[in-house]
Amino acid sequence: MYHNSTQKKHWTFLSEDEPLRRRIQANVRYRARIRATEKPRLSEIFSLEPHEELAICKYYEKRLLDFCNAFKPTMPKSVLGTACMYFKRFYLNNSVMEHHPRIIMLTCVFLACKVDEFNVSSIQFVGNLGENPLGQEKILEQILEYELLLIQQLNFHLIVHNPYRPFEGFLIDVKTRYPMLENPEVLRKSADEFLNRVALTDACLLFAPSVIALTAILSTASRAGLNMESYLTECLSLKDNQETMSHLLDGMRRLKILVSKYEPARPEEVAALKKRLDHCHSTEVTLSVHGRKRKGYEDDGYISKKPKTEEDEWTDEDFGDSL
């Protein structure tokens, strides 16, 4: 249950400022390590500010969703939600300058497939990237290198409660106990679109899955000219519990505001930032910072393989047409 979960205890925050604060701290920590290297000036030229890191993350979150939606065989929504949550959690405490979101994104999806028991082989997985066999092998090698780090940085909290299951539950409940809405299925398409927009925001770090699911249904109904507030008072028995009702409505209001004010990263901005990010990950800069522990904790015994040379690295274009 969500209310007893590690998600609620460790990964759900009371304020929108908390995820922002953690991202800034991750950026500051990494830039401090850059300044301590032999080439601080060279490294600082290409360093990213916190808001620039956020733009990069937004770009790769969208690519993550596109990859999952285009995946063959069809990927369950729960896997998409879990992967997106992993990605957001990882970059609360890590900088994109240290761990490139291109590979972290794929590692999040790969791990989510396992945790949510979506049975695809590693060959099937990388086959969705539109790469040649040699390229697929290189990408899979990197995914497997990063998998342990990802699990560590998630504090081994791998179970994610997504809004998709409660959404289906509420929809069934509306069908059986709310005759005022003749055909609740008419809400599904718009509600799915709302949940896709929610996935790009920090909502999963701020709201319970049930609140997100209920907001998807009621806001979709509202846009269709349907008032379902009586569903809350009658079917959910909140008529005599004004405090809970008020708290729920306030949460739904804040969630809708969060979704409405979301702004995707601008393509021209991302293009420039990606060039600087690639410089951050160039051999001359990264080796002096990370050494042998490039992909692991600084204080544990996990030693990664030697970083790939520049000619071995793969780019966003290696995703092919799958996105």
Swiss-Prot record:
SUPFAM superfamilies the record matches: Cyclin-like
Localization (cell): Nucleus
SMART domains for this protein: CYCLIN
Key words of the record: Cell cycle, Cyclin, Nucleus, Phosphoprotein, Transcription, Transcription regulation
Gene3D superfamilies according to UniProt: Cyclin-like
Name by which UniProt lists this protein: Cyclin-H
GO biological process: regulation of transcription by RNA polymerase II; transcription initiation at RNA polymerase II promoter
UniProt biased composition (Acidic residues): 310-323
GO MF annotations in UniProt: cyclin-dependent protein serine/threonine kinase regulator activity
Domain of life: Eukaryota
GO cellular component annotations of the record: nucleus; transcription factor TFIIK complex
Its biological purpose: Regulates CDK7, the catalytic subunit of the CDK-activating kinase (CAK) enzymatic complex. CAK activates the cyclin-associated kinases CDK1, CDK2, CDK4 and CDK6 by threonine phosphorylation. CAK complexed to the core-TFIIH basal transcription factor activates RNA polymerase II by serine phosphorylation of the repetitive C-terminal domain (CTD) of its large subunit (POLR2A), allowing its escape from the promoter and elongation of the transcripts. Involved in cell cycle control and in RNA transcription by RNA polymerase II. Its expression and activity are constant throughout the cell cycle.
NCBIfam families named in the record: ccl1
